[in-house]
Amino acid sequence: MIISIQCVDNKVMLNRILEINEENRYISLSRGFVVIKQNSEILGQVPLEDISVLLLTAQGVTVSKNVLNSLAENNCITVLCGKNYVPHRMLLPIANHCFYTKNIKNQINCSEPFKKKVWQQIVIQKIKNQALVLKLCKKEYKLVEKIASLVKSGDTDNREAYAARMYWSSLFGKNFKRDKNGEGINSLLNYGYAVMRASMARSICSAGLIPVLGVNHNNNLNQFCLADDFFEMYRPIIDLIVYEKWSKGDQEVSSENKKALIKALWINVHTKQGNSPVFQSMHYLINSYVQSMESKNLSLDFPIWDGVINEDF
C-alpha cells in the first residue's frame, strides 16, 4: 500500500508525504517519476518534485541510489522506520543555501546562555500545549499549566519531565507508560512524531543549518538533535489526535489513522506572519532561530496553537 497526501493553499504547498508500508517493493526513478514496483508490476508512480518526505515503514524495501540522490537534490527527507514506527534513520539533503557556511558557524559559536534561554522557551511552550490538551480532553490541567511558569533557563530543574509524568497519567490513565517500543497508543504516537520530526528536519536543512547541533539534545548517537529540540512543542498536537482516536476505542495504526496523523501538518497555528499550517510555521520558527543567532537577540516565532483540529480527524 502507498499512502500519499498532498495539500495546497493560497500561499504555500507541502508536497506529498509518500509512505511505503508493504513488503517486497522496489523504488526506482523513471522520467521524473518515483516508481513503486512489486517484481515487474508497477503499483504506482509519483512525480519526484511532488514529494517532500519518503517514509519507509516496511522492512523489505529496495530503493535505488538514483532515487535517494534525486530526492535529496529536491530537498526531500527519507525516513527509515523500525518496529512500531520508531524512526531509526533519516537521510537529509545538504541545502544549497546562500548563507550555509555562515549559518553553521553561528550554530557552532552559539553561546550556552543563549541555548539555555531557547530551551527554556521551548519547554514552556510545550508544557502550555500539554495543559491545553488536558483542558480540551476535560482532564485536570491547572497544575500542569502552573508548571510552565516555573521553568528556568535551561530547564535546570527538569520541569519538562515532571510535567510529562503528570500529563501522560492524566491523559491516558495511570497505567499508561510512554514507551517508544510499545504498541497501540505508543505506535500511533511514534508514527505521528516521526512525520512531525521529518518535517522539522526538512525546515532545518532548508534554512542552511545542520540538525546534529542541538540546543538541548546532545546525544552522540542522535543525528537530529536540533529537530528533536524544536519539534517538542508540536508533540501535543499529535497527542490530541491520538487521544481522540483512543477515546473512541481505536488505537490501530491503520491507513485511516496514519492519514489523520499526517494531516496534522496542515492544522492552523498562529505565527507572527499570521495563520499558517503547522509545516509552514516550522519554517518561520527555524528562520527566526537563524536570525536570532545572527543578531544575538532572541526573538523566536513560536507557533501558538488554539487546540483546534480538523473535524475529519
Give residue spans per PLM region.
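Active-site helix-to-loop segments that bind/position phosphate- or nucleotide-bearing substrates
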Residues: 2-10, 15-18, 24-25, 46, ...
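N-terminal ordered "arm"
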Residues: 21-65
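N-terminal transmembrane hairpin
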Residues: 53-55, 62-98
